[in-house]
Amino acid sequence: MTTATETKTMPRLKERYRNEIVGQLREQYKYGNPMQVPGLVKIVVNMGVGEAARDAKLIDGAVRDLATITGQKPQVRRATKSIAQFKLREGMPIGAKVTLRGDRMWEFLDRLLSIALPRIRDFRGLDGRKLDGNGNYTFGLTEQSVFHEIDQDKIDRQRGMDITVVTTATTDDEGRALLKFLGFPFKEN
C-alpha cells in the first residue's frame, strides 16, 4: 500500500514570526521564558448589516462576501432584544462573524497586510493608539472590495467590516511591538 506524502507548507508570516520576530521581541523586552513572548491567538472579522432588519436578503450578500474573503463559513449573528425605533425584533439576523485561528488566521493576516491594506484609496496608515489595554487591536475597513477575492462586478452594495486581532500580549506596548514587527502599517504620531 502506498501512502501519499502530503507536504504542508507553513504560512509565510507564521514562519517569519517563529524565525525572526520572536527573537526580536525577546531581545527588546528581555523575556526569560520563550512562552512569555506575545503571539496571535485569533482574528475576528465582523460585518454588521443593520439594513437586514428591513430586507432579510441583504444578510446573504454579507455571508457570501465574508466567506469569500476569509475562506470559512460565517456565523450569522442575530438580535438579542427587540428595539422598536430600529424596527428590530429579537432573533432577526443583523450581522455575520468569522473567527480565524491557526494557519487560516496567518494566511488571512498576510493577505490583509500585503494586498488589501495597500489597495485602500488615500491610505495613510492605521492608528496605533487603538489598542484595548490588553494588547488586542481592532480596526475597521469601509468596503469589502479591497480584498482581491471579491469580484468587483458582483458587489451588490458596499459593506464595511471590523477586524479584531487578539494577542497574548499583556500591555499595549507589547501588542503594538508585535503588530509592528508583523508588518502593520501604523501612522507615525
From Swiss-Prot:
Keyword terms, alphabetized: Ribonucleoprotein, Ribosomal protein, RNA-binding, rRNA-binding, tRNA-binding
Matches recorded under Gene3D superfamilies: 3.30.1440.10
Gene Ontology MF terms in the entry: rRNA binding; structural constituent of ribosome; tRNA binding
GO cellular component: ribonucleoprotein complex; ribosome
Pfam families found in the cross-reference section: Ribosomal_L5 (PF00281), Ribosomal_L5_C (PF00673)
Classification via SUPFAM superfamilies: RL5-like
GO biological process: translation
Entries under InterPro entries matching the protein: Ribosomal_uL5 (IPR002132), Ribosomal_uL5_bac-type (IPR020930), Ribosomal_uL5_C (IPR031309), Ribosomal_uL5_dom_sf (IPR022803), Ribosomal_uL5_N (IPR031310)
Family the UniProt entry places it in: Belongs to the universal ribosomal protein uL5 family.
Subunit relationships: Part of the 50S ribosomal subunit; part of the 5S rRNA/L5/L18/L25 subcomplex. Contacts the 5S rRNA and the P site tRNA. Forms a bridge to the 30S subunit in the 70S ribosome.
PANTHER family in UniProt: 60S RIBOSOMAL PROTEIN L11-RELATED
Purpose of the protein: This is one of the proteins that bind and probably mediate the attachment of the 5S RNA into the large ribosomal subunit, where it forms part of the central protuberance. In the 70S ribosome it contacts protein S13 of the 30S subunit (bridge B1b), connecting the 2 subunits; this bridge is implicated in subunit movement. Contacts the P site tRNA; the 5S rRNA and some of its associated proteins might help stabilize positioning of ribosome-bound tRNAs.
Protein name per Swiss-Prot or TrEMBL: Large ribosomal subunit protein uL5
